[in-house]
C-alpha cells in the first residue's frame, strides 16, 4: 500500500484575484473608471519528494501559501517519485524535483517527455564513525561499512568513491547492507565500545548524530568525491525537471519558477532555523532534524552547461555500474535545458 500523499492545494485554497478598482460614480452621475490592473497568475503543479530534494523549495512553498509567489503553485510532496511520474509525463504535473537517476530513467522510458532544468541537491551521503580512525577514504581499508541501498545509487556511489581512492570495494573493505536506515542506526546505537562505521543519507545521518552524541561525521561523501575526481565531477542527488510540452509553451513561467527557486535556496542556506521550521510545517521532516541536516544536504541550483557536465559525469558512473540505474542507457543531449 502506498503512503498517502501530502498535498498542498494552494491553487484552490489561495487563488490569486484580479486587482480591479471599482468604477467610482461622481455626483454628476458620470462614471470615472479607474485604471484596471489585472494580474492573472498561471496555475502550475509542482511535485517533490519527502526528503532533501524538497528542502530547497520550502520558502517558495511558503510564498505560494501567502500568495506572494509569481504564479499560482500547487505543491505535491510524495513519498516516492512513482506517485507522480505518470502525471509528470502526461503534463498534469509541470515541474518536479526528483533523484537524478530517476529523471534519466523517465526521460529514456518516455522518449523525451521530460527535460532537466537544474541540479537542486548535490550529495546527501555522510560516512559516520563512532570512533576516530577514519579521516580519509583510504582509512576505510580493512573496515566494515554498514549502509543501505544495495543495487541502487548509494552502493554505486560508495564503490566509486572507494575505487577513486585506490581501494578495491570487494576485497579491501566489507560492505554490510541493511534494508533500512533505521537498521543501520540500530547497529551504531548498540556498538558499545566497538567502533562502527556507516554510510547514511540525510536526514537519517542527522537523526543518528542527535541520538548518539559520540558519533561523528567522518567524511562528507560529496567533498571526498570532488577531492578525488576534481570539482567538475560530483555526486548529484536531486534535480529539477520540467514536462517537455509545458516547457515549450511556458518559457516565461519556467524562468520565473527558476528565479523564485534560486531565492528559496539562498534563504534555506542562509536561514537554517527558519528553513527548518518550514520543513516541519510542510511535513517533510521534523525541524530539529532539519536544522542538523540542512547544512549537510548540499542544497543548490546549478543550471546550463555546468549542470549538464556534472549530471553527465555522475550518470556515467551509475551507467558503468549498472545501465538499468539510468533507464538502460545514457540520456542524449535533448535531456538538458541549456
Task: Kindly give the residue locations of the regions a language model identified.
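Conserved C-terminal helix/tail region of periplasmic/extracytoplasmic solute-binding proteins
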Residues: 312-338
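Pocket-lining segment of extracytoplasmic ligand-binding domains
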Residues: 101-102, 110, 182-278
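A bilobed periplasmic-binding-protein/Venus flytrap-type ligand-binding module shared by bacterial periplasmic
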Residues: 59-61, 125-134, 234-253, 300
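Short, glycine-/small- and polar/acidic-enriched structural segments
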Residues: 19-177, 202, 216-219
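Secondary-structure end/capping motifs
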Residues: 247-321
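Short, high-confidence coil segments that cap the C-terminus of an alpha-helix
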Residues: 93, 193-195, 318
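Short, solvent-exposed loop/beta-turn-alpha elements that line the ligand-binding surface or hinge
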Residues: 64-71, 223-233, 299-308
Amino acid at each position: 500500500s502506498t503512503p498517502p500523499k501530502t498535498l498542498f492545494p494552494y491553487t484552490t485554497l489561495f487563488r490569486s484575484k484580479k486587482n480591479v478598482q471599482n468604477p467610482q460614480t461622481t455626483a454628476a452621475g458620470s462614471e470615472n473608471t479607474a485604471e484596471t490592473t489585472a494580474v492573472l497568475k498561471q496555475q502550475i503543479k509542482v511535485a517533490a519528494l519527502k526528503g532533501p530534494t524538497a528542502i530547497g523549495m520550502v520558502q517558495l512553498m511558503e510564498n505560494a501559501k501567502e500568495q506572494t509567489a509569481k504564479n499560482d503553485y500547487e505543491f505535491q510532496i510524495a513519498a516516492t517519485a512513482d506517485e507522480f511520474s505518470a502525471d509528470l509525463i502526461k503534463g498534469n504535473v509541470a515541474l518536479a524535483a526528483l533523484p537524478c537517476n530517476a529523471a534519466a530513467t523517465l526521460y529514456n522510458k518516455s522518449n523525451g517527455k521530460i527535460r532537466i532544468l537544474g541540479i537542486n541537491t548535490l550529495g546527501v551521503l555522510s560516512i559516520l564513525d563512532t570512533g576516530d580512525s577514519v579521516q580519509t577514504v583510504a582509512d576505510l581499508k580493512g573496515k566494515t561499512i554498514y549502509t543501505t541501498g544495495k543495487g541502487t545509487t548509494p552502493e554505486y556511489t560508495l564503490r566509486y568513491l572507494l575505487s577513486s581512492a585506490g581501494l578495491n570495494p570487494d576485497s579491501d573493505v566489507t560492505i554490510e547492507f541493511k534494508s533500512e536506515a533505521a537498521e543501520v542506526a540500530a547497529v551504531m546505537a548498540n556498538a558499545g565500545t566497538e567502533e562502527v562505521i556507516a554510510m547514511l543519507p540525510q536526514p537519517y545521518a542527522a537523526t543518528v548524530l542527535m541520538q548518539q552524541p559520540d558519533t561523528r561525521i567522518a567524511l562528507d561523501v560529496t567533498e571526498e568525491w570532488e577531492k578525488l575526481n576534481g570539482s567538475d565531477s560530483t555526486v548529484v542527488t536531486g534535480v529539477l525537471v520540467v514536462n517537455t510540452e509545458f516547457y515549450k509553451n511556458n518559457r516565461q513561467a519556467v524562468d520565473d519558477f527558476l528565479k523564485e527557486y534560486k531565492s528559496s535556496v539562498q534563504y534555506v542556506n542562509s536561514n537554517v532555523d527558519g528553513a527548518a521550521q518550514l520543513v516541519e510545517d510542510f511535513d517533510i521532516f521534523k525541524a530539529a532534524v532539519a536544522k542538523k541536516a540542512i547544512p549537510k544536504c548540499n542544497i543548490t541550483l546549478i543550471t546550463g552547461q555546468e549542470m549538464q557536465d556534472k549530471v553527465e559525469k555522475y550518470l556515467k558512473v551509475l551507467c558503468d555500474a549498472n545501465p538499468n540505474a539510468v533507464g538502460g542507457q545514457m540520456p542524449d543531449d535533448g535531456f538538458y535545458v541549456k
